[in-house]
């Protein structure tokens, strides 16, 4: 936590700071923007404000991460994680996504979503 406070001070002085972490709650206290990665692919870019409520997040994995935070109940993300070296087609989260359709297996373009971007057809 002290390291994150130091990063925040650096950012307040105008320095660019990139934080890579699995501790989403801690990151949300420190950063302005979040890029969500899954299986080596960026799937959503959002402001910290978008992480205030689940419904402002667009990608199902981002929403699952939101629900998995301790303050939201530690909800388990079901399914099997892909092997990152596999040649994944389409959305890498599709095999674990309750809302996935056949379209999710194709190319997924970036689209504007709120204050960020998302790679999801939903």
Task: Say what each PLM segment does.
Residues 47-122:
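Short catalytic/signature loops enriched in Gly
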């Amino acid at each position: 936590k002290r390291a994150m406070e130091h990063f925040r001070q650096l950012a307040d002085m105008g320095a660019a700071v990139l934080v890579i972490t699995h501790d989403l709650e801690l990151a949300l206290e420190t950063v302005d923007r979040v890029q969500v990665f899954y299986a080596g692919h960026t799937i959503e870019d959002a402001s910290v404000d978008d992480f205030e409520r689940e419904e402002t997040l667009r990608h199902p994995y981002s929403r699952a991460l939101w629900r998995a935070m301790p303050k939201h109940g530690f909800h388990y993300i079901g399914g099997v994680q892909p092997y990152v070296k596999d040649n994944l087609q389409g959305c890498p989260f599709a095999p674990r996504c309750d809302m996935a359709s056949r379209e999710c297996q194709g190319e997924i373009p970036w689209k504007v979503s709120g204050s960020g971007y998302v790679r999801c057809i939903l």
